[in-house]
Amino acid sequence: MAPAPGMAPYSDEPTGPFHRPEHNDESTGRMSHESESSVSTTSIVFDRIEERLAAKEGHFELDDHDPMKEADDDDNDLETGRFLGGRSSTQEEDFPAKNDGMNRGMRRTLIIVAGLLISAWVVGLFFYVSHKSYKPASQIEHDPQATVVQGTGKQVTLDQVMGSYWRAESHSISWIESPDGEDGLLLLKDGPGKDFLVVEDVRTQNSAGVNAAVDVASSRTLIKERHFDFGGQTHTPGRVWPSKDLKKVLIATNLEANWRHSFYASYWVFDVDMQIAEPLIPGEPNVRVQLAQWSPTSDAIAYVRDNNLFLRSLKHDKVVQITKDGGAEVFNGVPDWVYEEEVFSGNSATWWSEDGNYIAYLRTNETGVPEYPVQYFLSRPSGTEPAPGEESYPEVRQIKYPKAGAHNPVVNLKFYDVARDESFTVEISGRFADDDRLITEVVWAGGQVIVKETNRVSDVLRVVLVDVAARTGKAVRELDVKAIDGGWFEITHKTKYIPADPSKGREQDGYIDMVIHDDNDHLAYFTPLNNSEPIMLTSGHWEVVDAPSTVDLDNNIVYFVATKESSIQRHVYQVDLSGNNLKAVTDTGSEGYYDISFSAGTGYALLSYRGPNIPWQKVISTPANAHKYEHMVEENKELAKSAREYELPIKIYGTIKVDGVELNYVERRPPHFDKNKKYPVLFQQYSGPGSQSVNKRFTVDYQSYVAAGLGYVCVTVDGRGTGFIGRKNRVIIRGDLGKWEAHDQIAAAKIWASKSYVDEERLAIWGWSFGGFNTLKTLEQDGGRTFKYGMAVAPVTDWRFYDSIYTERYMLTPQTNGHGYDTSAINNVTALKQSVRFLMMHGVADDNVHMQNSLTLLDKLNMVGVENYDVHVFPDSDHGIYFHNANRIVYDKLTNWLINAFNGEWIKVANAKPQKKRSIQPILPIL
């Protein structure tokens, strides 16, 4: 299950204006005031007006801590604040306006003293301003650690967070390997004032910082024009992949999405010297191809068409069909739905050997996998027209979708010998049975292949080493996680081959892998390839993240990102292949959340700072590079300007202890937070296994809008089961999803409910995908005692309905853990009745979390007469819910529903009563 769209699902599509009423007026909408009592209704609004009138008449005065004071009445606002408070009638009684009886000389003395004080104040103010000690609020830099927000009056809007207003500008660099050995080359596509596709030396971006002795590679054009013609038609490149020798470019046009990562396209081979294109498949320019990949030797392209693998030789200008059994149920070289979604997170299951002599590819047989129908009522994803007379019927797409406990696709790794034009399979003794085998990673290691495979519930791992030329193989590592911590093995795609180089001290081939060590994920170096006892490169009570990032083979340095400073930060580190000299690359003296991408030769890198301050990006030389270089490529000045001008929420980070376990939280407070007021609180969470929602990234998202725009407190707590707090706290959830995740949200809510500034009667929780499941599970487990409201988008409601590879990793199979599946499902629906109200939303065409989940729960609710909920469904929308403006409706619905909840409207609905009949007076005739 991918991270929930609800975490950052903002659409790039233009949206209409969102009207935010200025007052809590029944006729215009109901924006909640954070200062209200636990049930805010219209009568209380009138009470507030009367209390303000009473205050004005002197019955009581509004002090700085008055809970009835509006947020915009803040005395600290430099433009509108009251520097000198007026006197009330009570004060006037104590200090009459007349000065009867005051000595004239004393009056003169007081006037002189007052004049001197005022003069001194004016001089001091002039000095303060002239020496730039004073800055208007709009000029003060954004401080993520601030506990007080300077008042500028500008509020964050839903339009902004739904659009791109608060999105940091971010650039990616397509680093490419030079055929001439130069490092730091990048691919520039459609750059301003440049040819369409250009190879440049990264140092040309700022040649002023380059040592004169360093040769900067000259730019070279690969594709000059933005369009190309073929057969009388004009085509525009969608995606491009240069060959390794940079003499040709593989181009994809007319891209059409399939699933989350996969797509169909027309492919072309573009000649750089001639500046002309030809179809990848000679004579068939319009054929839809699923995948195309260059050979590392630049003389051939492997591609998949109709689930069969082909080889286009450019040297001999011919096409060879490698497989012939592909079709609706057999995939060659590309993954099926579940492998694309849960294993490879991509559209390729084809791997070239570095010498171009072999192709490894996955053969997937879905024959035994049951189908699930996805209905489209308004669109036709197939692109076909309905038969005459069938226009009124929905299009149905049948997906081979293995649910928990059902038959999995059968996968086998096969090899193709290019020179012999021969496919073959290498038999490995002791392998998992067909229905109990997952192949999760394939890495070429010289003439050998490292293959990772697990059983279907992911608690036994085998690392197999295949000698392709000899057509033999054996398991070199076999681990049972039950003997380690009772959890599961994560799927990774970062295993790195380290070739032997005696001149560099590497006597034999090896590889770097992520392993379980010290209750965390750490890096290990296995050498030779068949060694099962590694050199540990990292250790300690912290984790490496999706590592290694890269390896500098010239200097035997491994670069990686880790949580060494804090579980909610990310810094870049380096360590020698010996496991010595671990040190930070980024500044660990300041909080930071970094990621990094390296050039092909590891001499340069794009370093991206994501928070907590305004994000920036720069190209740097790596520590081992003798030629130092640094160039800022993005400072996000416009974002920084907006952060100065707008009143962003106050973010408070910390930890809470639940059952002795420290859990990270972030609390977003309204900009003019007053601890003496009573605030409603919204808990937002995802809670999925290994995920993390609390981090130090700079974000202004929907949760920020809830705090800064609506005036509520918004809290996120990463409970047990989430990532980066140790495997012990992660794997505790195995076999019973939802038990601990819900428990920890309830425990956190009780902590907040006890705070003086929280209205314990107005607590809500929401989430999307796994977060939607945990929202419902929390309401079920809590039974209305803590959380009064919940909002669940695209929720799983029974793990028997979700895909096997994801679900069984955490739940085992229904056949072996039936009780766990029963208790993890949303079954105790009478407990949901104890909350005030909850909301569910789902996309009808969700191919990931099927609509079946919500429909089944609705039936359970009907069976026991539960009615305190609302439902909204979105035709033709998938898991992201975007079709026909749906994403905007999701967030409008969340917002308005939440406002009604915190304004007490759902309490009225729960006890709906008709008004008394008014007597009807007879109309008398006019005489």
Swiss-Prot record:
EC number: 3.4.14.5
Active site: S769 (charge relay system), D846 (charge relay system), H879 (charge relay system)
Enzyme class, UniProt record, top EC level: hydrolase
A Pfam family this chain is assigned to: DPPIV_N
TM region positions: 109-129
GO BP terms: proteolysis
GO CC, any one term: plasma membrane
Cytoplasmic side: 1-108
InterPro entries for the chain: AB_hydrolase_fold, Peptidase_S9_cat, Peptidase_S9B_N, Serine_Prot_S9B/DPPIV
MF-aspect GO terms: aminopeptidase activity; dipeptidyl-peptidase activity; serine-type peptidase activity
SUPFAM superfamilies linked to this entry: alpha/beta-Hydrolases, DPP6 N-terminal domain-like
Subcellular location: Vacuole membrane
Family of the protein in this entry: Belongs to the peptidase S9B family.
Function comment: Type IV dipeptidyl-peptidase which removes N-terminal dipeptides sequentially from polypeptides having unsubstituted N-termini provided that the penultimate residue is proline.
PANTHER family xref list: DIPEPTIDYL PEPTIDASE 10, ISOFORM B, PROTEASE FAMILY S9B,C DIPEPTIDYL-PEPTIDASE IV-RELATED
Protein name stated in the entry: Probable dipeptidyl-aminopeptidase B
